[in-house]
Regions:
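Bacterial Sec-dependent N-terminal signal peptides
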Residues: 1-23
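A sensor for short, sequence-defined functional sites
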Residues: 22-636
Length: 636
């Protein structure tokens, strides 16, 4: 009976809640930060959260704090369970500390958690946490020394004034030494968002206390494929660092002082061996970048004190043949220097914007090499294994900072021309009197599109044939494949990928004495794995949020079809042409004798798009989808 009553109550509550109801509500979220002269910060967070339904109860059954024991100390100071009936339960005794689940990066990150136990809708969790330290470790010492941030004497923070759940009140307060000249700025406030953050400051002796308050934060209804929340919703950046040049000088110095880029005799010998056949400086850069990309496996094994901004030294990386992005970047810097280049480590933020306030807006380490003419070229050995690029164009329109002895300013990678990432499909086919189709179809690709096509080879060799056959059978399930030819995947640097299919497809077209109806095989979005724009939902006519695709791209399709007879009339799908720098589209059908030719071109000009680009982008995608689904009709 009790179970039935609980189920009945749950159903009633679900029916009573609006369709957009949130599972929990944050009643208040208050953070107080005190910064010391060294940059060490003491952070106290006080939250009270209400479970609105049983899903919220489940979500709040455990409260967790993620931290790195090498660089941060955390504790729960108070955890109370406020029952809806007014009873209050202290659950602070149920505190656990476990090593956090890890995949590919094994640095010993931990989770401190409190088991709340059973909750009912309407119950509230109130907890107070204390933290000192930072996200990344550098060089540790005694006592609080290991909790001082890498850029000693400086403080930075990124505070989201957005939430996935409703927040009735959010307060962020920081007490900083006035002499530190704390700088701050609110971002993403404008037409769509009125930040509505109240800012107060008071001077207390040699300190200035800044308080930022916002009431009634409501969750944003995100549009599909929108940018990261920190790029489109209100956030606060704070930093005592004077500018990006200072951060650049620090990043250069901390790794040079550690000796991250000193080549060992073994590394020098390997570099000499690799560049022996290079004819130009670009040859040497490409050879070394791809060697690091393909031979240093991505796996983060902790070196103990020193993880974070410090790049592992060359001896460790070359011996272990594994590491995370910073280790692969460090290995490449070392090898380039061993080859006589001026090379430097750099930091970037993958798939999220870096703003002008010099807070720690980085999640990825890369490499910069200086050419003889003084220009820099960005290299990313982490993102280009088996990719015919030196810097992944999936990172175009992305901010980065090079660590230089004289300092560097924040910069952004440029657009990569769509022609650098072409997908070309060429088919020669013949329709028989029985409506069958036979012939060949070839796909070639370059850049990021090349990598997407060659995804069929990213498995055991025994599975390659099945994967390639599947790509054709996705658009023609009845296809009988007689032969497949492809480029050597192990020698991917020598030429762009190319795969050719020879096939026959029974009952491909509808045919009678006077009419022939079919959709060209090449129009059916063959190898759509290389055309991520096709995964966009084109139903919405407008967008208010910027959005992102995998990469810029050019799709070119041509098919020559030999018909079983000559036809007088051709009826084909009508599409609206698109001519826009962000996206463009064109197609043609023409008939000569018993030959029909189909051609299509789709250009996607960016990785990151503005809402104003949606109309052209949407029409381009819709056109390609329509041609894939709409047949041509030929009559005599």
């Amino acid at each position: 009976m009790k179970c039935k009553n609980l189920l009945f109550s749950a159903v009633l509550m679900a029916l009573a809640l609006p369709a957009t109801a949130q599972h929990k509500t944050v009643l208040y979220d208050s953070t107080s930060v005190v910064m010391e002269e060294s940059g060490l910060s003491h952070v106290i967070n006080h939250q009270r959260v209400r479970a609105n339904d049983f899903a919220g109860c489940k979500e709040l059954a455990t409260v967790k704090i993620d931290y790195d024991p090498l660089s941060a100390y955390v504790e729960f100071r108070q955890v109370l369970l406020h029952h809806a009936n007014g009873n209050v339960e202290d659950v602070l005794l149920r505190v656990y500390d476990y090593v956090a689940p890890a995949r590919l990066i094994y640095w010993g990150a931990s989770q401190k958690m409190v088991h709340i136990g059973h909750l009912d809708p309407g119950d509230e969790i109130e907890y107070v946490t204390y933290r000192k330290g930072f996200t990344y470790a550098l060089l540790s010492g005694d006592d609080d020394e290991r909790y001082i941030p890498p850029m000693r004497g400086h403080f930075y923070d990124i505070v989201p004034f957005w939430s996935d759940s409703p927040v009735n009140k959010k307060v962020y307060q920081v007490s900083a030494l006035t002499a530190k000249n704390l700088r701050f700025e609110l971002y993403n406030c404008g037409a769509q968002f009125d930040c509505g953050v109240q800012i107060d400051s008071t001077v207390q002796g040699d300190r200035t206390v800044y308080t930022f308050t916002k009431d009634n934060i409501t969750p944003l209804k995100r549009e599909p494929r929108a940018l990261a929340n920190n790029d489109i919703q209100p956030k606060l950046l704070l930093s005592t660092s004077p500018n990006w040049q200072a951060k650049s000088v620090w990043f250069y110095g901390v790794n040079e002082d550690y000796g991250s880029f000193v080549p060992t005799p073994e590394v020098q010998a390997k570099v000499n061996e690799l560049v022996r056949t290079a004819k130009t400086e670009q040859d040497s850069i490409a050879i070394l970048t791809h060697w690091v990309a393909d031979n240093i496996r991505y796996a983060g094994i902790s070196m103990g004190p020193g993880e974070g901004f410090t790049l592992h030294n060359a001896q460790m990386n070359f011996t272990d043949r594994c590491g995370v992005c910073k280790d692969k970047a460090g290995m490449l810097v070392t090898m380039l220097r061993a080859a006589g280049f001026k090379a430097y480590a750099a930091m970037t933020m993958a798939h999220e914007r870096i703003d002008r306030i010099p807070a720690d807006q980085f999640n990825h380490s890369v490499c910069a090499v200086q050419h003889r003419n003084g220009t820099f070229e960005m290299l990313d050995p982490t993102w280009v294994p088996n990719v015919r690029e030196l810097w992944s164009s999936a990172e175009q329109q992305q901010g980065y900072l090079i660590g230089l002895p004289e300092g560097a300013d924040l910069a952004y990678t440029p657009l990569s021309a769509p022609e650098n990432h072409y997908v070309r499909i060429n088919a020669n086919t013949q329709i028989g009197q029985d409506g069958s189709l036979s012939g060949s179809i070839t796909i070639t690709a370059e850049g990021q599109s090349d990598a997407a096509v060659r995804g069929v080879f990213s498995c055991r060799t025994a599975e390659w044939m099945r994967n390639m056959e599947l790509e054709l059978r996705k658009i023609a399930p009845a296809a009988r494949i007689t032969k497949i030819q492809h480029t050597d995947n192990d020698n991917y640097l020598k030429q762009p990928v190319s795969i050719t299919y020879h096939f026959s497809i029974p009952d491909f077209a509808v045919i009678d004495k006077h009419t022939l109806i079919f959709t060209p095989l090449s129009a059916r979005n063959f190898f759509s794995r290389a055309m991520s724009h096709l995964r966009f939902d084109t139903a919405p006519e407008t967008r208010t949020q910027p959005f992102a695709d995998a990469c810029s791209r050019l799709v070119e399709i041509k098919e020559t079809i030999t018909l079983p007879a000559e036809y007088k009339h051709l009826h084909f799908p009508f599409v609206n042409g698109v001519a826009n720098p962000a996206a463009s589209f064109g197609c043609q059908y023409w008939m000569e004798g018993n030959t029909l030719t189909f051609a299509e071109s789709a250009l996607l000009g960016k990785r990151v798009y503005d809402p104003a680009d949606w109309s052209a982008f949407r029409q381009t995608v819709a056109n390609q989808k329509m041609l894939a689904e709409t047949p041509v009709i030929l009559t005599k």
